[in-house]
Swiss-Prot record:
EC number: 2.7.1.167, 2.7.7.70
Protein encoded by which gene: hldE
Entry annotated with the keyword Kinase: yes
Family per similarity comment: In the N-terminal section; belongs to the carbohydrate kinase PfkB family.
Official protein name in the record: Bifunctional protein HldE
Binding site for ATP: N191, K192, K193, E194
Keywords, sorted A to Z: ATP-binding, Carbohydrate metabolism, Kinase, Multifunctional enzyme, Nucleotide-binding, Nucleotidyltransferase, Transferase
Organism (species): Campylobacter jejuni subsp. doylei (strain ATCC BAA-1458 / RM4099 / 269.97)
Active site positions, chain numbering: D259
Length: 461
């Protein structure tokens, strides 16, 4: 799939709030003598494409032939966008082009200074006419709304109506609590907070998620209904609710992740990719982006690299793991086992375990430990091979090998929040249960076990 997509160059039109993201990198190592505030010494500045322009950059990085339509002011930021984007921009005199200046110190954002004009544009009719003139040449349209006055109700309704008449998919990254101006679009990509505001729901937990996502589809006549759920992935409603789980390994900065999601979805729909597969690829793109700092674009090569996991990076000693966990404010899930011949039952079990928290740690019995528990003929695979196989799964965050007969010492050392065991432990004592906040028992898939697989192989000889 990635190989096919990386060779495509679909023509995609993007309209919306084009901005400039400026990063001012500073040294903040002293306090001002004038007041109890930090002194920021500027080291360098980095001007980047932001808002709809970042979606443009993502689409271009993916290989699309992108064309931008928008309205900018007669200012330096407007000139920067015109110089760096292929497209046509209407100039509204006196209007401020959105400019966000992020003050960065020690890889942390400490302040943001915004220059912008959020009033509705005066050039609605001209923008609609320009769209009508260009639209027939494109495979998909993206409306990137940051509530800066470009995508007014009049503009949105006219653009969606025209594209729909030509059977061209329209994808919208919405803003605000009133989604009615986007009615008839192919899909919207609100995050959880935006969806809650539009739906007037208190939460989107449990059954409310399906009710809410279905209501969005029906109320706004969408082809597909999508809600991005941050670390929980992407929820999709076509004929039923499906969840494409998130795949981020490390999160440094969520800036621009939504732009990457809609860019990948647009690229995929322009090439006829099935919608759930498109959501899975969008998740992978977001995972790449949140591992970087600032508004950045993503390419198919980076997505390919993300899928090629460096197994050894996820295999840690308990000491390394404890240091890493101290740096994260995450819900830690722990399970353990021999995992000698990894099978379908193991995969489903670990996938379910991951859903219970943020970080899944698998405690793996060492070769010596497996021999004690299973006999001299085991393990079939070495501890390193078994650790690599487990680390290959995106839902496993870390693997730690232990020599003891039970994981009690390891659990005491790491102090996870949730301890997961198989449902066969229902009437048994779970080692480490008194150390953790919660024990969860997960049903195994029927008919799968390492012992049975070994017996089957022996019988065939």
């Amino acid at each position: 799939m990635l190989e096919f997509l990386s060779q495509q160059k679909p023509k995609i039109l993007i309209i919306g709030d084009f901005m400039v993201d400026n990063y001012t990198w500073c040294d903040c190592s002293r306090i001002s003598p004038e007041a109890p505030v930090l002194v920021a010494k500027t080291l360098k500045e980095d001007k980047r494409l932001g808002g709809a322009a970042n979606v443009y950059a993502n689409l271009k990085s993916l290989g699309a032939d992108v064309f931008a339509l928008g309205v900018v002011g007669d200012d330096e930021s407007g000139k920067f966008l015109q110089e760096n984007l292929k497209g046509e921009f209407l100039i509204q005199k006196g209007r401020k082009t959105p400019f966000k200046n992020r003050i960065m110190a020690h890889n942390q954002q400490v302040l943001r200074l915004d220059e912008e004009d959020t009033s509705e544009i005066l050039l609605e009719n001209e923008l609609i006419a320009l769209f009508d003139e260009k639209i027939k040449d494109f495979k998909a349209v993206v409306l990137s709304d940051y509530a800066k006055g470009i995508l007014t109700p009049k503009v949105c309704k006219a653009l969606i109506k025209k594209a729909k008449a030509l059977n061209i998919p329209v994808l919208v990254d919405p803003k605000g609590s009133d989604f009615s101006k986007y009615s008839g679009a192919t899909l919207l990509t609100p995050n959880k907070k935006e969806a809650l505001e539009a739906l007037k729901f208190e939460n989107l937990e449990g059954e409310n998620l399906e009710k809410g996502i279905k209501k969005l589809k029906e109320d706004f006549a969408l082809r597909y209904s999508i809600i991005t759920l941050s670390e929980a992935g992407i929820a999709l409603f076509d004929k039923s609710l499906k969840i494409a789980p998130a795949k981020a390994l490390e999160v440094y900065d969520v800036t621009g992740a939504g732009d990457s999601v809609i860019a990948v979805l647009a690229f995929c729909l322009a090439n006829g990719v099935e919608i759930f597969k498109a959501c899975e690829l969008a998740n992978e793109a977001a995972a790449v982006v949140v591992g970087k700092i600032g508004s950045v674009s993503v390419s198919f090569d980076e997505i390919k690299s993300f899928n090629r996991v460096d197994f050894e990076k996820k295999i840690k000693s308990k000491e390394e793991l404890l240091t890493l966990l101290k740096q994260k404010d995450k819900k830690i899930v722990f399970t353990n086992g021999c995992f000698d011949i990894v099978h379908f039952g193991h995969i489903k079990y670990l996938e379910k375990a991951k859903r219970l928290g943020d970080v899944l740690i698998v405690g793996l019995n060492s070769d010596a430990s497996v021999k004690k528990l299973k006999g001299e003929s085991r393990p079939v695979n070495s501890e390193f091979q078994r650790a690599c196989m487990l680390a290959a799964f995106y839902f496993v965050d870390f693997v730690v090998i232990f020599d003891e007969d039970t994981p009690l010492e390891l659990i005491s050392f790491l102090k996870p929040d949730i301890l997961v065991k198989g449902a066969d432990y229902k009437d048994k004592i779970v080692v480490g249960a008194d150390i953790v906040s919660k024990v969860e028992l997960i049903d195994f898939e029927e008919g799968f076990s390492t012992s049975k697989i070994i017996e089957k192989i022996k019988d065939k000889k």
